[in-house]
Amino acid sequence: MKKQEIVNIANELMGNPSKKQEYRLLNSLVGHHSIKRLTEEQFDTVYTFCEDVSKIREQMFKDLVTENDSEVDAIESIYNVSQSIKDMIEEAAFGELKKNTADILNRWWKKVWRVECRGNVAWNNCGTVQIGLKEFAKARLEFVGINAKNMFFGNEYKLAFRVERDTSFANEIRDLLMKFPILLPCNCEIREKESTTIAIYNVHTAKPLAAMTSKQMTKFLNELYTKKLNYCCYQLVERFKDYK
């Protein structure tokens, strides 16, 4: 989208501050303001608009001496709104996953789990959702190569078991899993030596994770963590106790 078009949209938004600007911008772009109702095409429209705003803002700061102050204010205003929409998208995509993951695993392991998004997961870029034991810094589970778009529209995900910055420990755990393959769930592959990614579990869902209701999400994750990964994780957690 061209700079003047974005400035015009920004001026229109600022002209009516009584309504939630994020909703008004979404209505302007896709005809409604529900993140959960975005089609894939509408998601791309919002993403492209926000990327255009970021690029124009960046260029305006480079050319600040020659820019019109009112245009700078307009772009800065709509940039802030677009970043708020980004936060809304991230929460809609990952909020239930993070909450349910923490709730389920904390019931099993006495409230010691943390769940965090890493990277620019709100858009099309690849990030991670890290799932770790608070007292063990060296090992964790991660949803890898994940972003809001495949949370809303995909049905294939990868859950990795990783060891951070400790290749010897990684190899020890890898050797344990190769020696006792019963510890691994189905659809799980062990990665090569010298890598801190130990294993990748391929997760397939009947519908996109972010499209699930809270009840559906709870049921799916409960099965994923407690039935398919529970035995493997429990055995590994016992091993982790020597590596605080």
Give residue spans per PLM region:
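Polyanion-binding interface signature
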Residues: N68-K207
